[in-house]
Amino acid sequence: MTFQNTREFAKQLDAQDALNHYQEQFIFPKVNDKRVIYFTGNSLGLQPKRTKAYIDEVMNDWAELAVEGHFYAEKPWWDYQERFSEPLSKIVGALPSEVTVMNTLTVNLHLLMVSFYQPKGKRYKIICEEKAFPSDQYMFQSQVHFHGYKPEDAIVEIKRREGEHNIRLEDVLAKIEEVGDELALVLIGGVNYYTGQVFDIKTITAAGQKAGAKVGWDLAHAAGNIKLELHDWNVDFAAWCSYKYMNSGPGNASGVFVHERHHNDPDLPRFAGWWGHNKERRFKMEPNFDPVHGAGGWQISNLPVLSLAPYLASVEMFAEVGMDALIAKRDHITSYLEFILHEIDKEVESTFEIITPSNPEERASQLSVFLHGEGRSLFDYLMKNGVITDWREPNVIRLAPVPLYCSYEDMYDFGQILKKGILGK
């Protein structure tokens, strides 16, 4: 399809978009009494209108049933998390038994590293990407310290080549081979938060395991955003947050994946708690831990149902839409946004550069735009004019055209506002 930078063409694309009506199912902030153009679903997704009803249901059950809500609520609280197994399994490409919800992202990665980072002898090193999200960096450093190693020795970062913004797959594979029998764990972000680069999870997982290491993934920017087949790709473990593309609300619960081949391994260590205990015997208060079969055996504490309610509202919407439809629109609307940016770049003196890969196979619902010069003032201009974007140091505006609530006309309007902002500087 040949794109056009006109409002009429954008409206035509919206009219043909099977997901366009979902935009009306979200609540948008307003600037100057006008609905914003929202590009920050990669930081915090918008609130679905249905969310309040899910929360109200829990609040009403709490008011009317109090403690009995654990067993007699409309959706009983004691097994509330099981409602996520089926929809989450489809979002991340897993068996229902391989996924659960609990805690928050970095907490879950720490807990999973208890099981899957077991340094021994000369096999103690961790491979991660250069400039991983800071929370991951702090996690790696603290885990390595805990086991008695020095981060500068035990943490191996895969570097970008000089003058390049993204990490080459061949460099990831070469680093895994180089570290070889010293490698204990590969843990990379499925989508890099800064550049929007999508990593080849299947190929990297196979390479890490061939080297004798466990392979896990931080899917904070991947879950609900890219096609995942965690079970078929033989991924050892993964975790993700739910408040970005999955629209569950600020700081909300995380999801975890543990491959089924690890479920019955008696030698695999884990930190345990009563919510990971055999569900049928949980309230018998027995002294010895008998883990729930599957990823649920990694749960520790009673789950925060009020937090899970908006998460459930979101995953049920995902089940309605389906990942294939989301990804099809994601690729198309991201390409249209890329086209708009290139058109603006032709019209004005070049002040920016898209650092996200141009290959649709290597990106998802994000374009990271590196701004030369006084980029922060352009970001501020966009915000004042109703375009909510995300600023990341150094000098990058991240744009996430989330397919559930962004329209093609939004892309056109953004381009016009961006052009005025650049020319007005």
Curated annotation (Swiss-Prot):
One of its GO terms (molecular function) is kynureninase activity. Its cofactor is pyridoxal 5'-phosphate. It catalyses: L-kynurenine + H2O = anthranilate + L-alanine + H(+); 3-hydroxy-L-kynurenine + H2O = 3-hydroxyanthranilate + L-alanine + H(+). Its EC number is 3.7.1.3. Pathway: Amino-acid degradation; L-kynurenine degradation; L-alanine and anthranilate from L-kynurenine: step 1/1; Cofactor biosynthesis; NAD(+) biosynthesis; quinolinate from L-kynurenine: step 2/3. GO terms for cellular component: cytoplasm. Pyridoxal 5'-phosphate binds at residues 105-106, 133-136, 218, 221, 243, 274, 302. The keyword Protein biosynthesis does not apply. It is an enzyme of class 3 (hydrolase). GO terms for biological process: anthranilate metabolic process; L-kynurenine catabolic process; L-tryptophan catabolic process to kynurenine; NAD biosynthetic process; quinolinate biosynthetic process. The modification N6-(pyridoxal phosphate)lysine is found at residue 244. It comes from the Bacteria. Keywords: Hydrolase, Pyridine nucleotide biosynthesis, Pyridoxal phosphate. Homodimer. Belongs to the kynureninase family. Catalyzes the cleavage of L-kynurenine (L-Kyn) and L-3-hydroxykynurenine (L-3OHKyn) into anthranilic acid (AA) and 3-hydroxyanthranilic acid (3-OHAA), respectively. This is Kynureninase. It comes from Flavobacterium johnsoniae (strain ATCC 17061 / DSM 2064 / JCM 8514 / BCRC 14874 / CCUG 350202 / NBRC 14942 / NCIMB 11054 / UW101) (Cytophaga johnsonae).
